[in-house]
């Protein structure tokens, strides 16, 4: 990443301004998607994306992200440094970038051919939504400095840029503290930051990203010379791969394509697709092109090398497939519920062509492994056709597979938009929930202690499990590739388990099941987790509830002590308490499950419940010190 520094000029005249910075503090959600945990971390991503863009342009190979004790975060890169010369608007280019919305060198594609970031609103929005922000630029042999408060320069600073000294280094450092007046929380989560930085390091081969948590004295370095090949290996670390990863790389018509493919003995399809470093969880043209190219290559090879070969479908081929698709597009277009579906039609053609020729070449060069894979695909086809015949036979015999489970206490409303289903752990708690609920719109489905471990069970075994069958028929929208979100009988599916280790285990099992077999529920925002209280505080005739240790401490201080009861199970609450604390829409706390939450649960479960004993041991050793409460 060290091209001739004079190859592309990056100066004040390259800074374009498309819009003024207005109303960001009044409507932050329009710019960063919300003021919760996701919006908070989006501030950090905006600054990180700028540094990664320097890496994509070839001028930066190291980025350091620090989470500081005072609640601020900083991002340091060794790129060219933001220009500091005077701009035609009468201010320094650095101040323009920091105070004007959509100002920067990314819009003409002259300075940056490709840039990342979903919203791409720029560091000015970070500035506007921070209590304070500092920026240091090492450029032209000098160190430049500016400081802002809630997006504005202090009156004494005017429009001046301070020069702190001389240097032979180059790059930009931005440090900011999110504004408590704007955000619901201002605490950066190490796990969220680490996951995103690790992902970026995989997607940008050779880029070194250092994460330092000053609060805990913890540091990690993410640096992967094998790029997305390493990501595929990591995704398959708890599964049995059938061959070494297939790697395809090409650039055509300005679109760069990288694909890594590896088949495993699992029956789960896992395709992760990215466009300009954005995780396109809703898929798009690059995924469509990938699937088409893969299917075409396999069928062409099979027709050429096997007698009496009958074409297999994409569904037959992709069972057990792990793939990472990464495209870099000059003008990406996104749509979909979360704006994470790529729609550029030209990308489909480029990806399909690259995957078709790359996979076909690999099959020709590896005949033994090709035969193993083809036999797997043919077996998958036979199993699919047999399952289809069995399904039709069941229908003909008029055995209604859509019959609602006997233990479901359904609600009276016929409108799916207002109906909600509580999946409750245990018959006892299920009984309390049935008494507590509002029968008009709340349905209760009690499930036994442990549902099946979907990590070790294939689709056939999953469908034989009574608890899973009850969940599938209650929701009424099918499963796997036949899942149809429009047929879901409820707008909210709420997981309600005990606040102990067993409850967490069952919750993780359910999240993994929904992620693997009913993912559209999560993508559409239908899945929630109930938050029952951990404590009841009795003071005289009054009862108070606390949902965390911090809230318990705060409540005890406010009411002046009291009798504390810790709830280990939902069954310890009577129906009235359960309604007041956990089920009443007026009072309850629900956590909406995101795709990232479910993905983390799935990865955690692969480690803890998979076949790889070594990974499980390493995970337990690494996290044993974090255990605070054990219900023994």
Swiss-Prot record:
Similarity remark: Belongs to the type II topoisomerase GyrB family.
Miscellaneous: Few gyrases are as efficient as E.coli at forming negative supercoils. Not all organisms have 2 type II topoisomerases; in organisms with a single type II topoisomerase this enzyme also has to decatenate newly replicated chromosomes.
Ranges for domain Toprim: 419-533
Catalytic activity: ATP-dependent breakage, passage and rejoining of double-stranded DNA
Record: residues binding Mg(2+) 1: 425, 498
The protein, known as: DNA gyrase subunit B
Subunit annotation: Heterotetramer, composed of two GyrA and two GyrB chains. In the heterotetramer, GyrA contains the active site tyrosine that forms a transient covalent intermediate with DNA, while GyrB binds cofactors and catalyzes ATP hydrolysis.
Known cofactor(s): Mg(2+); Mn(2+); Ca(2+)
Key word DNA-binding present: yes
Top-level EC class: isomerase
A GO CC annotation given for this chain: chromosome
The enzyme's E.C. designation: 5.6.2.2
UniProt binding sites for Mg(2+) 2: 498, 500
Protein origin, superkingdom: Archaea
This protein's UniProt keywords: ATP-binding, Cytoplasm, DNA-binding, Isomerase, Magnesium, Metal-binding, Nucleotide-binding, Topoisomerase
Site (Interaction with DNA): 450, 453
GO BP terms in the entry: DNA topological change; DNA-templated DNA replication
């Amino acid at each position: 990443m060290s091209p001739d520094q004079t190859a592309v000029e990056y100066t004040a005249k390259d800074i374009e301004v498309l819009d003024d910075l207005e109303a960001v503090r009044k409507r932050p959600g329009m710019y960063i998607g919300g003021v919760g945990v996701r919006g908070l971390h989006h501030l950090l991503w905006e600054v990180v994306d700028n540094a990664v863009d320097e890496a994509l342009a070839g001028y930066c190979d190291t980025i350091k992200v620090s989470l500081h004790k005072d609640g601020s975060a900083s991002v340091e890169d060794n790129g060219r440094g933001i220009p500091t010369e005077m701009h035609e608007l009468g201010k320094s280019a650095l101040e323009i970038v920091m105070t004007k919305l959509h100002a920067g060198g990314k819009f003409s594609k002259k300075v940056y051919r490709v840039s990342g970031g979903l919203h791409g609103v720029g560091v000015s929005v970070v500035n506007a939504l921070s209590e304070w922000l500092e920026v240091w630029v090492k450029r032209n042999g000098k160190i430049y400095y500016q400081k802002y408060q809630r997006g504005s320069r202090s009156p004494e600073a005017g429009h001046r840029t301070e020069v702190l000294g001389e240097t032979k280094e180059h790059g930009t450092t931005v440090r900011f503290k999110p504004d408590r007046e704007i955000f619901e929380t201002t605490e950066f989560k190490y796990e969220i930051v680490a996951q995103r930085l690790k992902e970026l390091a995989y997607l940008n081969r050779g880029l070194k990203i250092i994460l330092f948590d000053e609060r805990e004295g913890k540091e990690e370095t993410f640096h992967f010379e094998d790029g997305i090949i390493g990501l595929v290996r990591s995704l398959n670390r708890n599964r049995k791969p059938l061959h070494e990863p297939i790697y395809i790389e090409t650039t055509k018509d300005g679109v760069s394509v990288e694909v890594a493919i590896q088949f495993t003995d699992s029956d789960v399809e896992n395709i992760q697709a990215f466009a300009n470093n954005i995780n396109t969880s809703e898929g798009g043209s690059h995924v469509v092109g990938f699937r088409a190219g893969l299917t075409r290559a396999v069928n062409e090879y099979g027709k050429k090398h096997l007698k009496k070969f009958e074409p297999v479908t994409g569904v037959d081929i992709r069972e057990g497939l792990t793939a990472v698709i990464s495209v870099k597009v000059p003008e990406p277009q996104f749509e979909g519920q979360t704006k994470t579906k790529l729609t550029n039609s030209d990308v489909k053609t480029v990806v399909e062509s690259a995957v078709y020729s790359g996979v076909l070449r690999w099959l020709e060069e590896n005949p033994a492994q090709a035969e193993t894979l083809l036999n797997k695909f043919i077996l998958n086809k036979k199993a699919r056709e047999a399952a289809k015949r069995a399904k039709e036979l069941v229908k003909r015999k008029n055995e209604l597979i859509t019959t609602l489970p006997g233990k479901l206490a359904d609600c009276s409303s016929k409108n799916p938009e207002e109906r909600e289903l509580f999946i409750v752990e245990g018959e006892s708690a299920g009984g309390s929930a049935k008494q507590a609920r509002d029968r008009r719109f709340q349905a209760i489905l009690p499930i036994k202690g442990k549902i099946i471990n979907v990590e070790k069970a294939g689709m056939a075994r999953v469908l034989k499990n009574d608890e899973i069958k009850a969940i599938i028929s209650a929701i009424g929208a099918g499963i796997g590739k036949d899942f149809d979100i429009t047929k879901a009988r409820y707008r909210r599916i709420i997981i309600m388990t005990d606040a102990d280790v067993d409850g967490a285990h069952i919750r993780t099992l359910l999240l993994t099941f929904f992620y693997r077999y009913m993912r559209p529920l999560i993508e559409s925002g239908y899945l929630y987790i109930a938050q029952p209280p951990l404590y009841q505080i009795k003071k005289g005739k009054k009862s108070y509830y606390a949902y965390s240790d911090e809230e318990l401490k705060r409540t005890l201080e406010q009411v002046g002590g009291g009798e504390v009861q810790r709830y280990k199970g939902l069954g310890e609450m009577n129906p009235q308490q359960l309604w007041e604390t956990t089920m009443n829409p007026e009072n309850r706390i629900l956590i909406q499950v995101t795709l990232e939450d479910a993905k983390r649960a799935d990865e955690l479960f692969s480690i803890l419940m998979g076949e790889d004993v070594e990974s499980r041991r390493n995970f337990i050793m690494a996290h044993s010190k974090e255990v605070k409460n054990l219900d023994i």
